[in-house]
Amino acid sequence: MNFKIYETKIREEFELVLKWMHNEFIKLRTGRATPAILDGILVDYYGSMTPINQLANISVPEPRVLAIKPYDRSSIKDVASAINASNLGVNPQVDVDIIRLTFAAPTEEVRKNLAKKAKQVGEEAKIRVRHIRQEAQDLFKKNSSTVEDDKKFFQTELDNLTKELNKEIEAVVSHKEKDIMTV
């Protein structure tokens, strides 16, 4: 019985869970400016909805400031109105050819709520790992012999791998919580 086949499949699915966690954590604003905050904002550009990062150069000149410089100066008002409509909680400051977004430092209460949301994301990731584990068990039962030693070995290896993956999730969540709570 070869556990490595199952382990490889589980780790591939776990990588998808980590990517999902990363995307969810990007949505949690820590007060620092990051271009990823603007992912998902679409601008009405000549009749088609276009992602903002395809219309402008986005940079971080200061830790709490995003600078957005549209490639086409005529689209600056459209970009600013799309940012306003996105409910980021930031008012764009429009200059001649650049838009500045200044993010306020989150209060203690807001940081605690963000840390709580980070924990919820971690719990959801653990649930996803449990689903992956269950799928692996079902696949093993369907494809394996009925030798009791093989079943015990598989179960032990699967439990160890699940614990390892959950520890990795906890480490990522702990790091994010520290990041959020840092003033």
From Swiss-Prot:
GO terms, molecular function: ribosomal large subunit binding
Top-rank taxon: Bacteria
Major location (coarse): cytoplasm
Swiss-Prot/TrEMBL keywords: Cytoplasm, Protein biosynthesis
InterPro entries to which the protein is assigned, alphabetical: Ribosome_recyc_fac, Ribosome_recyc_fac_dom, RRF_sf
Coiled coil location: none
GO cellular component terms given for this protein: cytoplasm
CDD domains, alphabetized: RRF
GO biological process, one term: translational termination
Subcellular location: Cytoplasm
Family statement drawn from the similarity comment of this UniProt entry: Belongs to the RRF family.
Function comment: Responsible for the release of ribosomes from messenger RNA at the termination of protein biosynthesis. May increase the efficiency of translation by recycling ribosomes from one round of translation to another.
Protein name: Ribosome-recycling factor
Organism: Ureaplasma urealyticum serovar 10 (strain ATCC 33699 / Western)
